[in-house]
Curated annotation (Swiss-Prot):
PROSITE patterns: PARP_ALPHA_HD (PS51060), PARP_CATALYTIC (PS51059), WGR (PS51977). This is Poly [ADP-ribose] polymerase 2. Its EC number is 2.4.2.30, 2.4.2.-. It comes from Caenorhabditis elegans. The gene is parp-2. Residues 148-285 form the PARP alpha-helical domain. Belongs to the ARTD/PARP family. Residues 105-126 have a biased composition (Basic and acidic residues). GO terms for molecular function: NAD+ poly-ADP-ribosyltransferase activity; NAD+-protein-aspartate ADP-ribosyltransferase activity; NAD+-protein-glutamate ADP-ribosyltransferase activity; nucleotidyltransferase activity. It catalyses: NAD(+) + (ADP-D-ribosyl)n-acceptor = nicotinamide + (ADP-D-ribosyl)n+1-acceptor + H(+); L-aspartyl-[protein] + NAD(+) = 4-O-(ADP-D-ribosyl)-L-aspartyl-[protein] + nicotinamide; L-glutamyl-[protein] + NAD(+) = 5-O-(ADP-D-ribosyl)-L-glutamyl-[protein] + nicotinamide. Poly[ADP-ribose] polymerase modifies various nuclear proteins by poly(ADP-ribosyl)ation, a post-translational modification synthesized after DNA damage that appears as an obligatory step in a detection/signaling pathway leading to the reparation of DNA strand breaks and programmed cell death. GO terms for cellular component: nucleolus.
Length: 538
């Protein structure tokens, strides 16, 4: 069987979803028009999201009649004509869900209609992402010139771990995403995720946005607080639309309203995880199209715009010492499995010039003594932790650490990149409950000239600029004092002390708003062991 295409070259295949909180609707409707050797079949599957649906087959001996039935059924469910399927969804009707597979096929169909350019041999010997859509002749030339270089087995294992689809699916399931889609490659398109971010921003505005967060600044921060700000509240249409375009599996429970910044932040974390997972899967799928004698994970590693090397035993020991530090409120301990040093990153930060005050010269006779050698000033850089889900690690290695998308009022200090000196704090963001093995990034961060804060401030970046500072340092109650140098940069390792200043924060955070002030130095694989109450008190 093969899917029949319309006059524009797009297949008669569509995935529809409809969520209506008021009626406890959370269902899908799949449609396909198939050619089976001259007979035409319209395949329909409908059911509740997360469960196996009911399948119906409609047979036709005439293609026009089959198309007419397909398009009429599509209009019945969406109130859109087939040629309008890319338009805005109609309220209280099914929405078209754009899958990654459909989006990729569409691009391929369009490229076939365009004239192919003459092959050009790229004389530059560069690493990193290879351009897609290259003509066959060019691929053959590149294949002959491929250097035979075996990658360290540890690196292959690393790539396999961070791109493991089963691990990704486990995390996505925990985030309530509809795992019934199958592998991440069969999930949503990246364009669909962008639409999801936009809807969440609209919902956030409807519950007050930054103004609502400012009104709660004087009170203790509660993770699941529903904002008590006078507003019309989030539109049910927007929430229904979001759930329809980003399908969730809630079983037979009523889909929850997205009516707080904490819930919006949780949904954004889901989209972030989906984005990273889909990007990794698309890369793997693209590699599988080309035959090669190389291991697929070696080829995947070669697409990275950076080099990774296993660290020496000495550095591994120092990183392990740093991981041994645990916050008193954290219920697990960390230990080192492996670590890799990042070399030649895609974006090398420029080192900020150090201002040296000129000492005024004394008048008088010239001294015949030679000047004493100048002692370099102590570095203000620190090695700090950044935690993220395993779904995001490959994307970060490809693109670097990115600033959050949208006006994220759920973040305590605005849209920066967050770092911590206590590793267990960063490990919280790795979703350690889902796996006993997580990945953390140990980053070189410029900590000079910070704006010091003792409570949440969502406009921290604006206050930082007004104060002519270069970063934000959120001072927590517990702060480490002891450090160990790793390749000349201090990293915090132990001896948590309580500061004298009054603060609403438990642990230190460093927030950066300029990419030149941080870079990834080590990718660290960490084992997570949950502690009992007795072990925590010891």
């Amino acid at each position: 069987m093969s899917i029949i295409n319309d006059e524009n070259g797009r297949g008669y295949k569509v995935h529809l979803c409809k969520t209506n909180i008021a009626q406890n609707n959370n269902k899908f409707y799949d449609m396909e028009l198939l050619d089976e050797g001259g007979d035409f079949i319209v395949k329909l599957i409908n059911g509740r999201i997360g469960y196996r649906g009911v399948t119906q087959l409609k047979d036709f001996d005439d293609l026009d009649r089959a198309k007419k039935f397909f398009e009429s059924k599509f209009y019945e469910k969406t109130h859109l004509h087939w040629e309008e399927r890319d338009d805005e969804p109609v309220p209280n009707k099914y929405a078209v869900v754009e899958l990654a597979t459909n989006a990729r096929q569409t691009e391929k169909e369009v490229k076939k209609e365009e004239p192919e350019p003459e092959p050009k041999v790229d004389e530059k010997n560069t690493r990193g992402r290879k351009k897609r859509g290259i003509v066959k002749e060019k691929k053959e030339i590149k294949k002959e010139e491929e250097p035979v270089e075996e990658v360290n087995e540890k690196l292959k294992e690393l790539m396999k771990c961070i791109c493991d689809e089963d691990v990704h699916l486990g995390l996505l399931k925990q985030l309530k995403f509809n795992e019934a889609f199958g592998r991440p490659i069969d999930c949503l398109s990246l364009a669909q995720l962008t639409t999801g971010y936009e809807i969440l921003s609209k919902i956030e505005e409807s519950i007050g946005g930054k103004s609502a967060r400012r009104s709660t600044r004087g009170r203790p921060r509660v993770a699941d607080r529903v904002l008590a700000v006078k507003s019309d509240g989030p539109s049910l249409h927007d929430i229904n639309k979001y759930y329809s375009l980003i399908p969730h599996s809630f079983g037979f429970c009523v889909p929850p309203k997205i009516d707080s910044h904490a819930k919006i932040q949780a949904e954004r974390e889901l989209l972030d995880a989906l984005k990273g997972s889909i990007e990794a899967s698309l890369e793997l799928k693209d590699l599988k199209k080309t035959a090669s004698s190389k291991d697929i994970y070696q080829r995947l590693y070669e697409r990275l715009p950076c080099h990774l090397e296993p660290v020496s035993e000495e550095i591994a020991g120092k990183i392990g010492d740093c991981l041994a530090m645990r916050g008193p409120t954290h219920c697990y301990k960390l230990s080192l499995i492996d670590a890799f040093e990042l070399k030649d990153p895609n974006e090398i930060p420029t080192e900020a010039p150090v201002e040296v005050q000129e000492v005024p010269k004394k008048r008088g006779r010239k001294s015949t003594k030679t000047a004493a050698p100048t002692v370099p000033p102590p570095t203000t850089k620190r090695l700090l932790w950044h935690g993220t889900r395993v779904t995001n690690v490959f994307s970060i290695l490809m693109n670097g650490l990115q600033f959050p998308v949208g006006d994220r009022c759920g973040l305590m200090f605005g849209n920066g990149v967050y770092f911590a000196n206590v590793p267990t704090k960063s490990a919280n963001y790795c979703c350690p409950e889902a796996s006993k093995r997580v990945f953390m990034l140990l980053c070189e961060v410029e900590t000079a000239n910070p704006l010091v804060l003792y409570e949440s401030e969502i406009d921290a970046d604006e206050k930082m600029e007004k104060a002519k500072k270069t970063s934000v340092y959120a001072a927590g109650k517990h702060t480490p004092r002891d450090t160990v140098e790793i390749n000349g940069i201090p990293a915090f390792k132990s001896n948590l002390e309580t500061i004298e200043e009054e603060t609403r924060l438990l642990y230190d955070e460093y927030v950066m708003f300029n990419k030149e002030h941080f870079k990834i130095k080590y990718v660290v694989e960490v084992k997570v062991d949950r502690l009992t109450a007795k072990e925590m008190m010891a």
